[in-house]
Amino acid sequence: MKNTFGQAVALTIFGESHGPAVGAVLDGLAPGLPVDEDYIRRQLARRRPSTTLDTARQEQDCYQILSGVYQGRTTGSPLTIVIPNENTRSEDYTYGLARPSHADYAAYCKYHGYEDWRGGGHFSGRVTAPLVAAGAILLSALDRVGVTVGTHILRCGGAWDRPFAPDAAADVAALQTAEFPTLTCEAAQAVSAEILQARERQDSVGGITQTAVCGLPAGVGEPWFDSVESLLSHAIFSIGGVKGIEFGGGFSAVSGYGSDFNDAFRMERGRVVTATNRNGGINGGITNGMDVVFQCAVKPTPSIGQPQQTVDFLRGEDAELTIHGRHDPAIIRRICPVLDSVAALVLCDLLTQRFGTDYLAKEARA
């Protein structure tokens, strides 16, 4: 089981849903980066369930930084964050009954029954909590070099938000203080209604998120196997529930011609820009200086309250299952800060590879 991502800046995650704690280790950080613990708490609060739209499992996420920080700044050694699990209810789960669209059976096949299956174990969304805590440190580092990241709900069920503006910086800034991750109040109300309707039916609903990265310099990334798209996709598909990703215009490119999809170059205030951004800020796997924009398909939460057909893989028998645990009718609201954090990991890694370890700390030390 490999749980580390990144080369110059690497993140390792550990822990299980109903174990003592979950946590993360960040390695390769430059020394001297300020660690804003208030911002870490705000990011964790964005991920934490807080309304009738979310799971009833309430965790306080009282994290502890065990290493890598001294007097409020990174030391350059591995930074370890641990978050205790304080509200578990393992009796809601029955080992051997494979929950449809969950990892129960696949994990049993891979780990030969030695996996911690309670609450989904290491496959649980609970493990995204330390990912978000670590991501907050990375997002702060990016912000100091002028790079910002934001994610909103573009679609949930039949409810739609507007897409990011062509220059997404103002929209991304607004998302940092938004109570709900949409760009319009109307979309927030419509998305909430879709989620509540799914909950009332003992069902769940999925959707589409849209993420924008603003302020990246041109020339970051590699062709072929370590392209910006390749690395973002690799990392983002590690998030449970993500089933698809597209950059810029993505699949809409198939319905037009090159003359429709090409992004024309022009000069603007001494800078090379494109008139449109259908390629999502990436050409040949390398950033071109425009906003990097991508959409993710998020499946409906597989845990629903309706009876479902399954198998008891220990007995080799067909079975029926009704899930009684505490689960989200939709994870699309809570997945937004997770996407920001994973994108920040990839970008910090790429920027450090391109410009060196001290690049992200140069403004902090000035």
Label every model-predicted segment.
Residues 1-366:
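Generic N-terminal targeting/processing segments that precede catalytic cores or assembly contacts
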